[in-house]
């Protein structure tokens, strides 16, 4: 299973509550924070919901 690096690049201020909770579920609390996750349907769905707030790269 591929690993993904997810980085928060935009602020969650003025975002709907479900998007804020999506960022928290991904483990992102601050701008510029990077977390690593497995690429599975659950994580991909969370990333899709906040795709305008994060950048995603495949881990090496």
UniProtKB/Swiss-Prot annotation:
Gene3D superfamilies noted in UniProt: Ribosomal protein L30, ferredoxin-like fold domain
Keyword Cell wall biogenesis/degradation: no
One of the record's GO molecular function terms: structural constituent of ribosome
GO biological processes: translation
Entry's Gene Ontology cellular component terms: cytosolic large ribosomal subunit
Entry's family note: Belongs to the universal ribosomal protein uL30 family.
Oligomeric and partner information: Part of the 50S ribosomal subunit.
PANTHER family: LARGE RIBOSOMAL SUBUNIT PROTEIN UL30M, MITOCHONDRIAL RIBOSOMAL PROTEIN L30
Name recorded for this polypeptide: Large ribosomal subunit protein uL30
Source species of the chain: Flavobacterium psychrophilum (strain ATCC 49511 / DSM 21280 / CIP 103535 / JIP02/86)
Taxonomic lineage: Bacteria, Pseudomonadati, Bacteroidota, Flavobacteriia, Flavobacteriales
């Amino acid at each position: 299973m591929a690993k993904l690096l997810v980085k928060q690049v935009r602020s969650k201020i003025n975002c709907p509550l479900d998007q804020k909770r999506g960022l928290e579920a991904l483990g992102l609390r601050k701008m510029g924070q990077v977390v690593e996750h497995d690429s599975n349907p659950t994580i991909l769905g969370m990333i899709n919901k906040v795709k305008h707030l994060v950048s995603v790269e495949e881990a090496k």
